[in-house]
């Protein structure tokens, strides 16, 4: 089978190599899937830049989410059957024609979804669900700020917040503002042209924000924290600001950390504000039952039509470098999907 290896850190054009490797064999409690589509996540870009501490050493096959058909099951496997259409998490290894993963990370695909849409619900959908329903509570009337609201996670968070009857502010670049309005965002803010904090203060008559979902980090996080009302929560689940320019080095990570600012527990206590960090890889490793729950609940929402995943663009697997550039340059709306 073919697999796409990250052979060295740096620019996408020279980072990847497609190689042949054996088809994996399912052990007890595992499933082998013939992959139709796999997804790109911003963590893949961070890993390619050499800035993701959880990534294995090179050469490594990246990839967290796939959709395809069950090829084989391990000993005593009774949950899934050969030939079933499934969607699944992978702890790396997703950039391949066949993947092996644990049964708890696999779910049957609804008939209403194609492989690309299913891929868009695995990591992005589960992350959005965990952020919105496990890490915090969204109350009717809450003012919610979602950064990168046109992205794979952001677009699903918008839909979840609107389902809870929240007032939603969303940031995106100029070309994506109409998409945000179509999703139901109450105030779409062009972060490339405007200071989102000033726009929100002017639009809300200085009313504060109850919940922020932030995948950007750095100064965006710091400025978002200043907008929080007493009782407000900021859920941080990414650091896209870490990636900038063409250099790969640890200095950018240090600059990012400094940009977040320094907070003490007493500061949070006195202001009655909360900072909640979300790393879905840690959830997968330490609370796999919660990850499975998130995927099940997202599937229920998709089947009921309360959320609709957006597939922004599909690339063929041999265009992996082009797809990485597309995601890294923030051209994407919704999920970027690769197809074999």
Tell where the protein language model's regions lie, with residue ranges.
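Short amphipathic alpha-helix with an adjacent loop that forms part of the alpha/beta core around
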Residues: 195-207
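Mid-domain Rossmann-like dinucleotide-binding core that forms the NAD(H)/NADP(H) cofactor-binding site
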Residues: 121, 126-194
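C-terminal hydrophobic helical "lid"/dimerization subdomain
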Residues: 284-340
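NAD(P)H dinucleotide-binding glycine-rich loop of Rossmann-like/cofactor-binding domains
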Residues: 37, 46, 85-148
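Glycine-rich phosphate-binding loop and adjacent beta-alpha segment
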Residues: 219-304, 340
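Short glycine-centered segments of the SAM/dcSAM-binding site in methyltransferase folds
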Residues: 85, 143, 167, 232-233, ...
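Glycine-rich beta-strand-centered segment in the early N-terminal region that forms part
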Residues: 22-39, 51-93
């Amino acid at each position: 089978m073919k697999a796409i290896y990250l052979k060295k850190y740096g620019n996408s054009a020279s980072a990847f190599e497609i190689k042949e490797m054996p088809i994996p064999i399912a052990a007890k409690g595992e499933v082998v899937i013939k992959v139709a589509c796999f997804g790109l996540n911003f963590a893949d870009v961070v890993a390619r830049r050499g800035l993701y501490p959880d990534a294995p050493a090179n050469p490594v096959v990246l990839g967290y989410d796939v959709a395809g058909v069950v090829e084989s099951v391990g000993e005593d496997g009774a949950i899934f059957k050969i030939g079933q259409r499934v969607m699944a998490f992978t702890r790396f290894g997703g950039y391949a024609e066949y993947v092996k993963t644990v049964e708890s990370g696999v779910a049957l695909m609804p008939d209403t979804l194609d492989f690309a849409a299913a891929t868009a619900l695995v990591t992005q959908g589960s992350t959005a669900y965990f952020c919105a329903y496990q890490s915090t509570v969204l109350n009717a009337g809450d003012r919610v700020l979602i950064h990168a609201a046109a992205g794979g996670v952001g677009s699903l968070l918008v839909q979840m917040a609107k389902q809870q009857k929240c007032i939603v502010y969303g940031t995106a670049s100029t070309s994506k503002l109409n998409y945000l309005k179509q999703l139901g965002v109450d105030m779409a803010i062009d972060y490339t042209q405007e200071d989102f904090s000033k726009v929100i203060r002017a639009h809300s008559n200085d009313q504060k924000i109850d919940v922020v979902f932030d995948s950007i980090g750095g100064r965006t996080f710091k400025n978002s924290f200043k907008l929080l009302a007493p009782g407000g929560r900021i859920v941080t689940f990414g650091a896209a600001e870490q990636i900038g320019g063409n250099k790969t080095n640890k200095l950018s990570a240090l600059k990012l950390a400094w940009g977040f600012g320094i907070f003490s527990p007493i500061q949070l206590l006195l202001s009655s504000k909360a900072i909640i960090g979300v790393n879905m890889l840690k959830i997968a490793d330490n609370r796999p039952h919660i990850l499975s729950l998130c995927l099940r609940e997202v599937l229920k929402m998709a089947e009921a039509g309360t959320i609709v995943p957006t597939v922004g663009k599909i690339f063929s697997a041999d265009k992996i470098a082009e797809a990485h550039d597309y995601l890294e340059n923030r051209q994407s709306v919704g999920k970027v999907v690769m197809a074999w």
